[in-house]
Amino acid sequence: MSKLKLISPAVPNVPWQDKPEGHTGAPVWRYSENPIIGRNPVEGVARIFNSAVMPYGDEFIGVFRGEQVNGIPYIYLGRSKDAIHWDFDKNKIQFVDEEGKPFMPIYAYDPRLVKVEDTYYIIWCQDFYGAAIGIAKTTDFKTFVRIENPFLPFNRNAVLFPRKVHGNFMMLSRPSDSGHTPFGDIFVSESPDMVYWGKHRHVMGKSSEWWESLKIGGGAAPIETSEGWLLFYHGVSGTCNGYVYSIGGAILDIDNPSIVKYRCENFLLTPEEWYEERGFVPNVCFPCATIHDSESGKIAIYYGAADSYVGLAFTTIDEVVDYIKEHSVVTTSDTEEGR
């Protein structure tokens, strides 16, 4: 039983593998059978990566970034009995507008999947006169209705909170430019209806730590805990041979997520294995989802690896929160409301 409380439903069949003997460093360890999704997983799809999964009934469901053989990314639906071995629909998700008419994005990538009350929301990056945030909703994973674009371009890495805060939906995002953005901070915005968004607040920016000195962006949906919102995010460093994407951790205030309570100065996971270092885009660990069990405190982290694979890692709520707090370094802009 965890000493900290995960405020979420129990998921007794959360995928899990015990920490390897002799493991050192941050308390996040890889699944020994990684990657869980390899190349050419579906006819016409070269790679699946940067994808989001969650419990659905007694099994699991997910939305997956499928890079087609023509290079265009779309979102595919997948199902699994154990959240490790996945079966994918052969065709990409067919979106409609609120009148039921076909309404497909030009492209769609890096989806997140979050349930708020009785509705599942898919959030992704799309083309809206440049890179922008797209949102769709479903209640049955059969009909996917696109709703209004929340923000102007350019924006990426949007992540919806799993419940309303003070009666409003809350969403993290990372304003950007139209290309491979060499900058970026995390902001939070709120909405009464998932249409009109405002009260934009700065959450946190890049830091002086080398692993996240270029830019940062939201990752998996924040996890509600008795200590605050646990956020796994990505941090990027620039090297003479390109960018390196690592996974970081922070804890946001439960009532005002623009305030950072703790922020780990060390990365939690950085590219080290072949499937993280070698691929279409080398040196990438990009978190997009977690599955967590409130009874045991177990957390499974799903991340894109080298823009080519899906990796799985594990931690526990007690270990990761203790580590973040023990190695926390926050700035004035982190701890103040960013307005």
Predicted segments — roles?
Residues A220:
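Catalytic core of Fe(II)/2-oxoglutarate
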Residues M1-I106, V114-L214, I223-N283, S294-K298, ...:
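Beta-rich carbohydrate-recognition and catalytic domains
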Residues C288, H292:
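C-terminal substrate/ligand-recognition segments
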